[in-house]
Amino acid sequence: MEVKVVIGSNYGDEGKGLTSANLARKAANKGHKILTVFYNGTMQRCHSIGNAVYHSEAAGTSWGSDTYYHSMFVVDPITLWLEQARVYIDPNCRLILPCDVLSNRTVEKARGDKRHGSCGFGLFAAVQRSLYPEYNLLAHELLDPYSLYLKLKKIQEHYPMDWDEVYNTDNFMKAAAYISNNCRIIPFFDLLSKKDYEIIIYEGGQGLLLDQSNLDNFPHLTPSSVGLFNIKEDIEKLTSFPELYYVSRTYITRHGAGPMEAECKKEDINPLIIDEVNQPNEWQGNLRFGRIDLDSLYKRIQTDAKQFIGKPSINLVFTQLNYTKGKLITTNGQQEIIKPDFCNRVFISSNKTEVFNI
């Protein structure tokens, strides 16, 4: 079994889905069975699959990859239901409720010009609610409709909001029924014992600069561990030689409030940059741009990789070369892409569909 891990190196939106899809494509072309594991965050991903954008399935779905939600992934049942996704789910995944979404958005609005940078998906509110056992809701509870309804009523008492408008119980129960009938709630290693997967792709959300341990940027962080922390023990049971893919654009972006390394204007990079997924929105505002501090980038990659006990292969992936004439836009000006000593291989991408080796 081969294990590959795709990690964003910056503030997210680096091209993790593109990288994951290419790994799946190459595996599928060799006839391998593939499982992609989402191991942090929630349905914040924006994967283009066919002519649509999906938040709940792997980018490698088009290449036959199954999708699994790790126990540290926070599931939004409503999104799963609306997108009619078919996935495997760890029984201990925490769940996002409609009231979590509204709570997150209400609090973020109230912050005015001191926003934390929420995506408005309800992740932080769900994580905070889960700290209280009586209000925590886990994926395996979706399989018992009666107990689920009673738990929802109890959570209603925790949130002083109108039940019918905010909690949307009917839709949530429909989502639970959909998941019970169309998805499978199963522990990770139980799934592996029943399926002969040859390639496991762990795909992270967000980027290392948003990791909850990066206290220099608090509170403008995601409430999850972005790098290897959540999955290192699982990986060590599977292999001693995982392939790690740390992804970055040839410049840096940030969508949302908070400090940013070497921020600059889009025009300083390329005024013609078009980002179809990261459009201006109420919660994150306009996409922001910056230059790469290579020393900082390489340091955080090596720090994350050192968490793994074994001999991982560290690879770099640089995307969006088409906007920077094949160069890195760094704090020291434009630079050629050169493989650093700690790195095994460097991959590049100049379009939306393919990643190439150099």
Q: Model-flagged regions — what are they?
A:
Residues 1-358:
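Non-transmembrane, aqueous-exposed alpha-helical and coiled segments at domain scale
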